[in-house]
């Protein structure tokens, strides 16, 4: 039976997510940006939280853990490399590990760059990728702890997933990401189409996610750093994809 996924807006622009297994009743929260909205969503659905799957240690992704764990006595799954930064963890995971949420299975991908401990969760049976702050729609996370080559390799790992996977990212940044991407690839038809879609979604007060990875591969300039026309557009023709990516990220940082 397919999982039920709910998007839960938290804080200013964070996305919380609940993924529920109807067959067992198990429910996981992907990160815990803020307890109150997640509790309200759980109570609305009549679900009990059994697990919190943490992607990285930043406060806007773990701030609700203590309250949720106290209320639901749920298991906290965290990156192995987070160590003491996520003290409430009951299980620490690394690349290739599989986390079970009732009958659902999430495969762990290590995706460092934004932070060194960052992981993503792939629910293959439900074609769902929870990438938090590694990959955004039409964007990617800032590189705070890792290096640009490290982040590029993480993006390549996610780009290798099938086109029909749906991306669930950590923040609603898509409109600003589109604005930047159009300065690099103004003639990209897929990006132009996504820009119109995003304008309609935000105008109606709807989230811009999920979006398929297939769409992102065509429209997200940060996933296209190895495309010659992208390198040429920023004066980096002939440079390595990692260097092109780094220049794109620097430009976005300063935009």
UniProtKB/Swiss-Prot annotation:
Known pathway: Secondary metabolite metabolism; methylglyoxal degradation; (R)-lactate from methylglyoxal: step 2/2
Catalyzed reactions per annotation: an S-(2-hydroxyacyl)glutathione + H2O = a 2-hydroxy carboxylate + glutathione + H(+)
Binding site for Zn(2+) 2: 60-61, 133, 171
Superkingdom as given in the UniProt entry: Bacteria
UniProt record, GO biological process: methylglyoxal catabolic process to D-lactate via S-lactoyl-glutathione
Entries under CDD domains matching the protein: hydroxyacylglutathione_hydrolase_MBL-fold (cd07723)
Keywords noted in UniProt: Hydrolase, Metal-binding, Zinc
Function: Thiolesterase that catalyzes the hydrolysis of S-D-lactoyl-glutathione to form glutathione and D-lactic acid.
Recorded family membership: Belongs to the metallo-beta-lactamase superfamily. Glyoxalase II family.
Protein name (Swiss-Prot/TrEMBL): Hydroxyacylglutathione hydrolase
């Amino acid at each position: 039976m397919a999982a039920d996924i709910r998007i839960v807006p938290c804080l200013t622009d964070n996305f919380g997510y609940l993924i529920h297994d109807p067959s067992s009743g198990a429910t996981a929260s992907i990160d815990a940006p803020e307890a109150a909205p997640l509790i309200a969503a759980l109570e609305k659905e009549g679900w009990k939280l059994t697990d919190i799957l943490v992607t990285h240690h930043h406060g806007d992704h773990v701030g609700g853990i203590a309250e949720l764990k106290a209320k639901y006595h749920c298991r906290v799954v965290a990156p192995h490399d987070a160590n003491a930064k996520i003290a409430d963890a009951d299980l620490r995971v690394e690349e290739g590990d599989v986390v079970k949420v009732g009958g659902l299975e999430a495969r762990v991908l290590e995706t460092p760059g934004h932070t060194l401990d960052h992981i993503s969760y792939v629910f293959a049976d439900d074609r769902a990728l929870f990438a938090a702050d590694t990959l955004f729609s039409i964007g990617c996370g800032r590189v705070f702890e890792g290096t640009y080559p490290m982040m590029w390799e993480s993006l390549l790992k996610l780009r290798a997933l099938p086109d029909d996977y749906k991306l669930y990212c950590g923040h609603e940044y898509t409109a600003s990401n589109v604005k930047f991407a159009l300065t690099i690839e103004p003639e990209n038809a897929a990006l132009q189409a996504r820009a119109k879609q995003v304008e309609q979604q935000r105008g109606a007060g709807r989230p811009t996610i999920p979006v398929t990875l297939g769409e992102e591969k065509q429209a997200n300039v940060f996933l296209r750093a190895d495309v010659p026309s992208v390198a040429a557009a920023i004066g980096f023709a002939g440079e390595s994809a990692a260097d092109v990516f780094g220049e794109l990220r620097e430009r976005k940082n300063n935009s």
